[in-house]
Structures are given as structure tokens and as C-alpha cells.
UniProtKB/Swiss-Prot annotation:
The gene is TAC1. Residues 109-119 have a biased composition (Low complexity). Belongs to the TAC family. The keyword Cytoplasm does not apply. PANTHER family: NAD-DEPENDENT PROTEIN DEACETYLASE HST1-LIKE PROTEIN, PROTEIN TILLER ANGLE CONTROL 1. Plants silencing TAC1 exhibit erect tillers with a very small tiller angle. A motif (IGT motif) lies at residues 56-62. Keywords: Growth regulation. Transmembrane segments: none annotated. GO terms for biological process: morphogenesis of a branching structure; phyllotactic patterning. Expressed in the leaf sheath pulvinus, tiller base and tiller node. This is Protein TILLER ANGLE CONTROL 1. The keyword Methyltransferase does not apply.
Length: 259
């Protein structure tokens, strides 16, 4: 409130208004023009403020410019006719150049250079077509490899491995290797024998024979008769002061018999 009062006093003291006589008709026309200008300015400002946020982006410094410059659709619509005009101009230029070239070339000119150039053009075009076809075939093959099923791709390494011959070691190979190694060991164990006149020619025992030589086992005893078994058991019991009936689980009230 204090600022408003201060501004009012400042305007009253420092008034720069110049009074002069003006024709009423001119004043009315100027007033109408100013009103129209203010209305149009307000409308454009409102449109600009409405179009400031295009696609969620705040455009700073665009007030006072053309509204259509803020709309991308209008820009695209303006660019399309320009592009079409450029294309038409280029086509017209090409047609004019072709017509001039036809006029410049004489009708009675020999056709030998043209016929010489035609095979070269045909060869180059055929080479381009072949390259293009090769490229297309490679692309199709690559696409087919990508589209193949996963199980086929997983089975392929297994199939490739089956084609390779595997060398397997069998039991026969192991036994043969063991026999070969044992024969080598026997050859090493045999010392060099020098035959001397009058000496014995008996071969010394090999190392493997000594290793495999077993100690003589004791002869198994013959089975004892029933009477001998019983007598042996009776001796043991009498020596330990045990009655024979106690072995069968019977209890004697009188106690064991002492010898």
C-alpha cells in the first residue's frame, strides 16, 4: 500500500503530460486504432503464451515472434512444397539437358562408338546384378541360421563329435602294456652271465619269481573223532572246576562238584 501511495505522489509531482488541442474526429480514429492494436497484441500474446509449452519444453525469448514458428507441423507443411518445387526444378533441368544433348548429336553420326560402349555397360550391369544376388543369398542364409530351432543348434556339436573317431583304451590294451612292462623289468633284473669253464650253468632266480614266491603253508590237521573231542572238553571242565550240566543252562542247588 505504501508503494502505491509513493507512486501516486511521484506522478503528481513529476507530471510530463503536455496538453494540446486535437480535432475530435482524429482523436476518435486514433483511439479506435489504438484499441484495435491493443486487442490484436493481447490476442497474439495469449496465443504465444498458450503455445510456449510445446511438447513440455519452455521456449524462452519467443514472445513477439510468429506463432507458426513454434508449431512443428506448420514448419513441415511449409517445407514440403519447397522440396516438391526443388524436385520439379531438377527434373526440368534433366529434361532440358537431355533435349540439348539430342540436338547437339548429328543424325548421320556413325553408330560404332555407341555400339562399342554398349557391351561394356552390359558387362558392368551384369556384374552388379551378380554381386547383388550373392549378397541376397548370403543374407538369406544368415537369416535361416538365426531362425533355426534351438534343439537343432544344440545337437549339432554332438553330431560333429560323433564323426570324429575316438581312440578307446580297452582291457586287452592294458594287459598288453602290463605284460610289456613286466618283461622289461625281468630283462633288467637278469645280470650279465659270464660262462667260465668248470663253473655251474644254473640260472639265477629272477626278481619276479622271488616276489611271487610264497611261504609254505602248514598242513591242515585231520578232523578229530567225537570221543576225543568229548574227552578234551571233559579235561578242560575238570581243570576249571565246571560241571558239564552247567553248559546246558541247568543250575545245581548243591553247587559245583570239587575234585
Amino acid at each position: 500500500m505504501a508503494l502505491k501511495v509513493f507512486n501516486w505522489l511521484n506522478r503528481k509531482k513529476h507530471s510530463n503530460v503536455e496538453y494540446c488541442t486535437i480535432n475530435e474526429n482524429k482523436a476518435m480514429e486514433e483511439k479506435e486504432d489504438s484499441l484495435r492494436a491493443s486487442v490484436t497484441e493481447q490476442d497474439t500474446e495469449a496465443l504465444l503464451l498458450r503455445d510456449v509449452l510445446i511438447n513440455g519444453i519452455l521456449a524462452i525469448g519467443t514472445l513477439g515472434h510468429n506463432v507458426n514458428s513454434l508449431c512443428p507441423e506448420s514448419c513441415i507443411e511449409q517445407d514440403e512444397p519447397i522440396i516438391m518445387c526443388d524436385e520439379k526444378v531438377e527434373q526440368e533441368k534433366c529434361e532440358e539437358e537431355k533435349a540439348e544433348a539430342k540436338q547437339d548429336t548429328p543424325v548421320t553420326a556413325p553408330s560404332e562408338p555407341a555400339s562399342a560402349l554398349e557391351p561394356a555397360k552390359m558387362h558392368s550391369s551384369s556384374m552388379k546384378e551378380d554381386n547383388f544376388m550373392c549378397f541376397v543369398k548370403e543374407e538369406i542364409l544368415m537369416h535361416g541360421m538365426e531362425v533355426e530351432d534351438v534343439p537343432n543348434i544344440q545337437e549339432r556339436p554332438l553330431l560333429m563329435l560323433e564323426k570324429v573317431e575316438k581312440v578307446r583304451t580297452t582291457l586287452a590294451d592294458l594287459f598288453a602294456a602290463e605284460a610289456f612292462s613286466s618283461s622289461d623289468a625281468e630283462d633288467k633284473c637278469y645280470p650279465k652271465i659270464v660262462i667260465v669253464a668248470g663253473a655251474s650253468t644254473s640260472k639265477p632266480t629272477s626278481c619276479m619269481e622271488k616276489m611271487h614266491h610264497k611261504k609254505p603253508t602248514k598242513p591242515t590237521s585231520k578232523p578229530l573223532k567225537a570221543t576225543r573231542k568229548l574227552s578234551r572238553v571233559m579235561r578242560k571242565m575238570l581243570g576249571k572246576k565246571i560241571h558239564p550240566e552247567q553248559l546246558n543252562g541247568r543250575s545245581n542247588a548243591e553247587g559245583p562238584v570239587t575234585a
